[in-house]
Amino acid sequence: MATRGANVIWFRHGLRLHDNPALLAALADKDQGIALIPVFIFDGESAGTKNVGYNRMRFLLDSLQDIDDQLQAATDGRGRLLVFEGEPAYIFRRLHEQVRLHRICIEQDCEPIWNERDESIRSLCRELNIDFVEKVSHTLWDPQLVIETNGGIPPLTYQMFLHTVQIIGLPPRPTADARLEDATFVELDPEFCRSLKLFEQLPTPEHFNVYGDNMGFLAKINWRGGETQALLLLDERLKVEQHAFERGFYLPNQALPNIHDSPKSMSAHLRFGCLSVRRFYWSVHDLFKNVQLRACVRGVQMTGGAHITGQLIWREYFYTMSVNNPNYDRMEGNDICLSIPWAKPNENLLQSWRLGQTGFPLIDGAMRQLLAEGWLHHTLRNTVATFLTRGGLWQSWEHGLQHFLKYLLDADWSVCAGNWMWVSSSAFERLLDSSLVTCPVALAKRLDPDGTYIKQYVPELMNVPKEFVHEPWRMSAEQQEQYECLIGVHYPERIIDLSMAVKRNMLAMKSLRNSLITPPPHCRPSNEEEVRQFFWLADVVV
């Protein structure tokens, strides 16, 4: 059948073929001879490429390669993902001139940082009489619908959010998989493709001047992106969930924190949209229901289960809080963030924290793991974030956010900024409270008693026995010589007196709290139990 134009499926964050309503919309006219053009555009910002480290870029490229491989496999080589470099409006205008576009279909990117990009394409579509189709599938609910249902304002507490989405109803089930076998694809003129900077094959991170950070030798896990990998990991994760449900645990990653084993988290694949959040949500809930029914047959009553996907709901909450707030990632102009007078940026302290050179082994191990792998256990994220802000260095959370956005595989703008505001007490129920500050030394002894994790990522301490590995400064000069770890030479001195810093910070928080007659509105949990469901809270404090 001769083509009568084409529909574009423009991949940005939803880097998958399953549960992709935008892809289904782009395929809806295939029986009328409308071809499909799958597109990804490196515009310097989309998919988090404005501030990106090597592991994040490699994960993105893996994900794009996986889409291309699946398209070619499903269509006997007729279909492929077209990966361009340039300005989206210009590329779509040129494509329209070449093949006449009927629709440009996208998965909604609800965060305000994408508004300008998407509005430029809406404007182009109006000008050229192209349908612009936007589908909600990166979130469980449309954040704008949540705000509308809540009376036009974002629900400031998690409990308010739960109440609002209960009014809306359960999130939609995943859509059917797209049938690509009988789809037609456009063959573009090679010279035209070159003029639009179409990659003949996917580039490497180095093409974008993105290089490794000299920590790769420490990597224990090399994460691989892509839908195929995401679905394999989902199967493994569901086995873990089932085992946990059958033992009465509903949040296995929080109930049994383990910083040593390979992580079972799906968050990186959710962040890039390699895994549908709706598929994850319903897979877990359907699994729990089946386990519950089998238990009932045996005469065992399984209660609870309301929080089995609590982390996904917190994700929705942060998206909703940010959707109408373009300043959500900073203090200035951010109405829900408390303006804590953090210390003037100290580049020496900041760089020591970024590179894992603080003199505190757990902090250093975690920060080096982040650089090497792009990953940190949830507990370690909270620990290094607290250390940077209210629990140690008294530096603004904005510095930590930018570092995480660059290196953390699963860091997205809304959720990462929300977490940083929360951990730093910039948006917290117990206003400006620093009474509980996790001690990185005590926590390390609890989570890593033999120093296995520390020695993996801080090899300077490889020969140090476990009684000193978490406090190497306690070694005598003779012991430092014996274990080949001279403090200040092989491993850095502590950059702060942590006990004094915590006391100073607590007083600063208390003083600021007393100065606020009317606390500003800020996103927050409704009670302490919600805090414990979100964080894994250590009960070891400075």
From Swiss-Prot:
GO terms for cellular component: cytoplasm; cytosol; nucleoplasm; nucleus; perinuclear region of cytoplasm. Blue light-dependent regulator that is the input of the circadian feedback loop. Has no photolyase activity for cyclobutane pyrimidine dimers or 6-4 photoproducts. Regulation of expression by light suggests a role in photoreception for locomotor activity rhythms. Functions, together with per, as a transcriptional repressor required for the oscillation of peripheral circadian clocks and for the correct specification of clock cells. Genes directly activated by the transcription factors Clock (Clk) and cycle (cyc) are repressed by cry. Signal peptide: none annotated. Expressed at higher levels in the head than in body and it is more expressed in antennae than in legs, wings and mouth appendages. Prominent expression is seen in cells of the lateral brain, which are close to or coincident with the clock neurons. Abundance oscillates in a circadian manner. The gene is cry. It comes from Drosophila melanogaster. Changing W420A: Abolishes formation of the FAD radical. FAD-binding region regulates cry stability, cry-tim interaction, and circadian photosensitivity. Photolyase/cryptochrome alpha/beta domain is sufficient for light detection and phototransduction. The lineage of its organism: Eukaryota, Metazoa, Ecdysozoa, Arthropoda, Hexapoda. Transmembrane segments: none annotated. Binds 1 FAD per subunit. The bound form of FAD in the inactive state of cry is oxidized FAD, not reduced. After activation by blue light the FAD is in an anionic radical state, which would be paramagnetic. Green light, which reduces levels of radical intermediate, has an antagonistic effect on function. Residues 5-140 form the Photolyase/cryptochrome alpha/beta domain. GO terms for molecular function: blue light photoreceptor activity; DNA binding; FAD binding; flavin adenine dinucleotide binding; photoreceptor activity. Induction: Expression is regulated by light and circadian rhythms. Under circadian regulation, expression is influenced by the clock pacemaker genes period, timeless, Clock and cycle. This is Cryptochrome-1. Belongs to the DNA photolyase class-1 family. Keywords: Biological rhythms, Chromophore, Cytoplasm, FAD, Flavoprotein, Nucleotide-binding, Nucleus, Photoreceptor protein, Receptor, Repressor, Sensory transduction, Transcription, Transcription regulation. Changing C337A: Accelerates formation and decay of the FAD radical. FAD binds at R237, S265, S267, Q311, H378, D410, A411, D412, C416, N419. Interacts with tim and per; promoted by light conditions. Interaction with tim irreversibly commits tim to proteasomal degradation. Interacts with l(1)G0136/CG8198.
